[in-house]
Amino acid sequence: MAQDIKNEEVEEVQEEEVVETAEETTPEKSELDLANERADEFENKYLRAHAEMQNIQRRANEERQNLQRYRSQDLAKAILPSLDNLERALAVEGLTDDVKKGLGMVQESLIHALKEEGIEEIAADGEFDHNYHMAIQTLPADDEHPVDTIAQVFQKGYKLHDRILRPAMVVVYN
């Protein structure tokens, strides 16, 4: 009988320990879960911050490349009227051959310098394209001249890579 009492006491103590252990593991699991959630939160914040930094660097690189690519835009816009004036001067009657030759050389050197910077003349023959041409006058279309074709160029247009610096001013058959 003494043995039975000891066995019962041992069983009760073991049951109490099991209950206490079960109660203790639940808070430990919740603390572990909380710690894991916080770790996941920090990892998520880190990944977002890292992605944001990469986006900032990418945008800065793109902006730097665009600045480099279009650096001569303002200078070209300032030079184009002078180039137009040279063309008008060459069209004047009564100039000596030496003067025409000199003006032609200056014009060629300016055009060459602009081409080196990526500035090109916009083609102003054939069909009218509102992206590159500005219609300043219209003429009636006929059998020889279909609708939306360019009749005459008043002022040449220029572009820098894919940007329009100045559209070509043209007369269009309508």
UniProtKB/Swiss-Prot annotation:
Superkingdom in the source lineage: Bacteria
Coiled-coil ranges from the UniProt annotation: none
Keywords for this protein: Chaperone, Cytoplasm, Stress response
Subcellular localization: Cytoplasm
Gene Ontology terms describing biological process: protein folding
Biased composition regions of type Basic and acidic residues, renumbered to the chain: 26-35
Molecular function per GO: adenyl-nucleotide exchange factor activity; protein homodimerization activity; protein-folding chaperone binding; unfolded protein binding
Biased composition (Acidic residues): 9-25
Predominant location: cytoplasm
Keyword check for Transport: no
Cellular component GO terms, alphabetical: cytoplasm
Entry similarity comment: Belongs to the GrpE family.
Quaternary assembly: Homodimer.
Annotated protein name in UniProt: Protein GrpE
Organism: Streptococcus pneumoniae (strain Hungary19A-6)
Gene: grpE
